[in-house]
Amino acid sequence: MSLERTPPYLQVVAALKAKIVSGELKHGDTLPSVRDLAAQYEISTATAQKVHRTLKAEGLAEAKQGSATTVSTRRTLHRTAADRLESALSTGRIYADGEYAVITSAALAEPPEWVADLLGTESGQAVRRERVTHSADDQPVSASVSWFSADLAETVPALLVRDRIIGGTPSAIEAATGRRAVATEEATTAAAATEDQAALLGVAAGAPVLLSRNVYVDAQGDTIEVGESVAPAGRWRVHRD
């Protein structure tokens, strides 16, 4: 496999990042060696070494003395709403290997005005689900709140149950209604953790966090889900073209 654009090492880094985000390369997996990278991508060993150094600098890989370079994501990788939607639709799993979620609440509630506008709800009520996602070593990696139109409470009653929905909510909604989430729009900003967010993430109130708001839409562009999530500092968000 050859690379046409420069700088070559960034192209290889991007290819490996895509495999890490998708879960093809999991935490603890061995990365291709310098020699293997050089042969696979037709690059020099010096360039291949730069690939390893870049992934280590970004916290996505680690190497111990005398050992191979391995994937390291439990404390460094922030998976976006788009990443999780892609995983749910392609594999039936919304969480990465080793991750698990705890649903802390599921009920009908009055949504904030910005959520109501996006959902197009006029009833004053919507389904609200709150969850905290943990890594395999039980560290919180994000806390999120998802909102759905109140009419989905009847067609997808699992939304009002404080339990994980196997395969994720997008798959459950598609199975019940035929509406498939095909895209997500996401906006992010740096913020200071509120007291509630700090308690969920295990950080100090006022600590820097990444705040994201996302919207899942179907093929007609209609909103299926509106969400807001918060993640602690020090986790890398990987963008894929």
Curated annotation (Swiss-Prot):
Residues 34-53 bind DNA. One of its GO terms (molecular function) is DNA binding. CDD domains: WHTH_GntR. One of its GO terms (biological process) is negative regulation of DNA-templated transcription. Controls plasmid transfer and prevents the lethal effects of the tra/kilA gene. Repressor for the transcription of certain pIJ101 promoters, including those the from kilA and kilB loci. It comes from Streptomyces lividans. The gene is korA. InterPro entries: Bact_HTH_transcr_reg, Chorismate_lyase_/UTRA_dom_sf, Tscrpt_reg_HTH_GntR, UTRA, WH-like_DNA-bd_sf, WH_DNA-bd_sf. This is Protein KorA. Residues 6-74 form the HTH gntR-type domain. It comes from the Bacteria.
